[in-house]
Amino acid sequence: MIQKNWQELIKPNKIEFHAHSNPNVLSVVAEPLERGFGLTLGNALRRILLSSLRGAAITAVQVEGVLHEFSSIPGVREDVADIILNIKEIAIRMEEEGPKRIVVCKEGPGIVKAGDIRTVGDMEILNPEHVICTLDEGAEIRMEFIVNTGKGYVPSDRNCFDDAPIGLIPIDSLYSPINKVSYKVENTREGQVLDYDKLTLTIETNGAVNGKDAVAFAARILQDQLSVFVNFKEPQKELVEEQTSELSFNPALLKKVDELELSVRSANCLKNDNIVYIGDLIQKTESEMLRTPNFGRKSLNEIKEVLACMGLHLGMEISAWPPENIDDLAKHYEDQY
């Protein structure tokens, strides 16, 4: 059957999210993957994360009394070129479509920070402590910014428009809410196979989007782009219906052991032994379970009690286990047990 080309490939049964000390950094771990798929998916997701997620950025600035970016401002320690470099690093979250105009006015002495900007609507400055410039005694500055939404990097020459007022300076815009993405691929075990891939993506955002959502958005973009290459109707649903009508065992065996509310120790032992479904568990004998590292008699009794409540026990034989397309069957029956 042609659908076996994709249905018999192993799919990740575990997605984990690991927070870092920096709240804008998140690691996403997916395993197991077919050998080679870690590199394929890691590279694709990294490129999409860096290039294709939409965000907000300042596209132009107008400083009162300044005609061009090579000027200096009396009483301001930084020249206009340095101020523009600082402006590029202001991180903004804005749900509404741009362009929007925002203003900052301040008198010296003191430091002009991103948090001094008067925002509009739902706009939020994500790094309010970021320094824009430093004012001496008696100095005064007024700047007006244009904020727009978009994706990727846009050079300053594309932020120009014909009826721009004199003194409006277009600047380079980096719309992406993603600062940095890295990935690594390691070997992982599934059953007796030792060379499946484990993919770890580490994402640093500017705070406009969290890492978990960013990965979901990137995966959705990739899914949408690849869908145009699928030139046939998906037979998966028909296949599942055909199999479920001929199911020869209790559908409760398709329930995952994670849902049994076992103690942490027992759950970790099952996880380390790659026991995913109840159908996997009940085929184990007591002696096999006791040979599992860190698995003792107390954990064994706990599992036996839980299975007994379901009318099951260890050491059962199921001739049709594991069924073909087990993940789809589990989803089909998840509301029935």
UniProtKB/Swiss-Prot annotation:
It catalyses: RNA(n) + a ribonucleoside 5'-triphosphate = RNA(n+1) + diphosphate. Keywords: DNA-directed RNA polymerase, Nucleotidyltransferase, Transcription, Transferase. Its EC number is 2.7.7.6. GO terms for biological process: DNA-templated transcription. Residues 1-233 are annotated as: Alpha N-terminal domain (alpha-NTD). It is an enzyme of class 2 (transferase). One of its GO terms (cellular component) is cytoplasm. GO terms for molecular function: DNA binding; DNA-directed RNA polymerase activity; protein dimerization activity. Residues 249-337 are annotated as: Alpha C-terminal domain (alpha-CTD). It comes from the Bacteria. Homodimer. The RNAP catalytic core consists of 2 alpha, 1 beta, 1 beta' and 1 omega subunit. When a sigma factor is associated with the core the holoenzyme is formed, which can initiate transcription. Belongs to the RNA polymerase alpha chain family. The N-terminal domain is essential for RNAP assembly and basal transcription, whereas the C-terminal domain is involved in interaction with transcriptional regulators and with upstream promoter elements. DNA-dependent RNA polymerase catalyzes the transcription of DNA into RNA using the four ribonucleoside triphosphates as substrates. This is DNA-directed RNA polymerase subunit alpha. It comes from Bartonella bacilliformis (strain ATCC 35685 / KC583 / Herrer 020/F12,63). The lineage of its organism: Bacteria, Pseudomonadati, Pseudomonadota, Alphaproteobacteria, Hyphomicrobiales.
